[in-house]
Amino acid sequence: MFSFRTTALEDQLDKALLDGRVGCFCTQNCWDTARGRYMYDLFTERGNLKALFSPRDAELTPGTNHIMFDKEALEGLDAVVVEIQDAGARYFNYSKDVFHLMETLAGMENPPSLYIVDHINPAGRIVEGSMPSGDVEAHTPKVAHRHGLTLGELCDLWYNEIGATFALHVISALASDSTRQLLPWTIAPASDIPGMFTCEMYSGGGLWNNTTITPAIGTARPYEYLGAPFIRHNRLEVLPAPAGVLMRPCTFTPSTGRYEGQRCNGYQIMLQPGTEYHSLLHTLQLMRYFLERYSQFELLDGFESKIADPDMISYLKGEIPFLDLREHVKLEEQKWIRKAKRYSLYEDQPYRIK
């Protein structure tokens, strides 16, 4: 059973929420601006909060990027309320944790009802890339790299993909005062998604995590910067860059991650005002550029299952030209948009950069 609800969580009259045993699955993004409390405080005040699932460490702590749970902790609950901020790309760990939660509920004999308190997608309705083909990371739905959907819409899609039968209720992002009072990135969605531009960079930038070039994890501007100790700047060098994108040579020293404490040479990706940035295509161009110039640049374990697109791998290997890749991505984006529209819960629709 699926329902889409347009009134706020505290106004829901379901017995499971009013009198039942409730578990809350959330990050710092469940802050209620109107009432000055977190979502789970509602159930603490009602006296029926029985479980709280949240990241292990304080927010913005490097490496804090999963919500841990087990099936036993879900047994006996009447409702699980989820409120996280998705980041717009299918690799986002907290969203994959929600999909893992849904898989677990689908396998339970008496699962609790699942409530998703939806949020606006900080990466907007733009889509990039393709649906997975072949091996793919665990708990990953068949959506484009940058999907253009909200978490609630993704959960509706995943619910159908896994053939779930538990009750799923999505509470509209427009029902929340927080949506009207805050931009979706005001409270950082995760330790590596800290700012306004991060989500625009993440659909491509997230792929660097499975290479020997770091996307500046452990700095204040991850995914806007990239680099490695082996990169050498050359004043005459011309990096691939689409219209409206500038590449500034820079250095940085990450406080954590692959090159913790090491000076990295690299680049800052800067977007001119009004630019609609196709992070995925640009990242693939940069990767091919570095693969052709640095023997130290490698694609590591997990890269192929993360990108999950044979044509993109062929491009990186130099087997097809960029024009062929771009046409492939165009067709795949059109295919994804047709599918995505079936799960759209809001007036604005996913679209591609032309």
Where in the sequence are the language-model features?
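N-terminal phosphate-binding or glycine-rich loops at protein starts, especially the Walker A/P-loop
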Residues: 1-47
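Glycine-rich, highly charged phosphate/nucleotide-binding loops
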Residues: 4-11, 61-73
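A short helix->loop->beta-strand "cap" motif at the edges of active sites that frequently abuts
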Residues: 47-49, 105-113
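Glycine-rich, charge-decorated loop segments at or immediately adjacent to ligand/cofactor-binding or catalytic sites
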Residues: 60-61, 115-136
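Glycine/threonine-rich flexible loop motifs
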Residues: 86-98
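Conserved anion/nucleotide-ligand pocket segment
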Residues: 135-205
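Glycine-rich, aromatic-lined ligand/substrate-binding cores of catalytic
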Residues: 176-250
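Conserved functional hotspot residues or short segments at active or partner-binding sites
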Residues: 222, 227-330
